[in-house]
Amino acid sequence: MKPNKKSKKRRVIQVFLLMICSMILFISYAAYDIWSSRFKTDEVDTDAAIVLGAASWNGKPSPVFRERINHAISLYNSGSIKKIIFTGGTKFEAEQEEARTAKAYALKHNVKDEDILIETQSRFTEDNLKNAQQVGIDNGLHTYTIVSDPLHMKRAMRIAKHIGMDAYASPTPTSAYKTLDTEIPFFFKELCSYIGYVTSLPIRSLKEIIK
């Protein structure tokens, strides 16, 4: 093999190894960031809490959703927030939307009806936040406390930042993901979702420029 061919092959291998190392570093940092910031709480009073949707069954919130709702109610009772925006639709027309389930639960726990806002169209985190932001704008709200599970917070706050929301983190102090059997799968799910979202941002920005 000629020297120049050897050097080209070496460069290709070096570039490939550099790409692999960069990917490993990026994934490792993302994993560390999600894990280390999971309990980061911003002690800031805001106009409203945005409760990210989760499953509801037969008009009752799932254990995961219930903990999110309870935390928002706690913030409301402490005076840290003035209103609560519940988010989430439903997969099936016959089922009650997640946001309506959450509202019914909050009303039973002495949250005033006029202090509850809902959006019932979203099914995913990004849409939860975008729709809630529009509800807030329509009701003259400006600052928000994002409420969700600890491992969900990093991605939620990254999305909130990208859409220009003045938002602060308040992860639930308790979670249905208590054991390694439930917490580890949820962690890796969030890691994949976070990486997917972050890596999609350059393409999203390019599309916005083209528009």
Predicted regions and their residues:
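Serine/threonine-rich low-complexity intrinsically disordered regions
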Residues: 4-7, 112, 202-203
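Enrichment for repetitive, rod-forming helical segments
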Residues: 18-21, 75, 196
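A structural signal for short, hydrophobic/glycine-enriched beta-strand patches
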Residues: 30-187
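N-terminal type II signal-anchor transmembrane helix
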Residues: 4-41
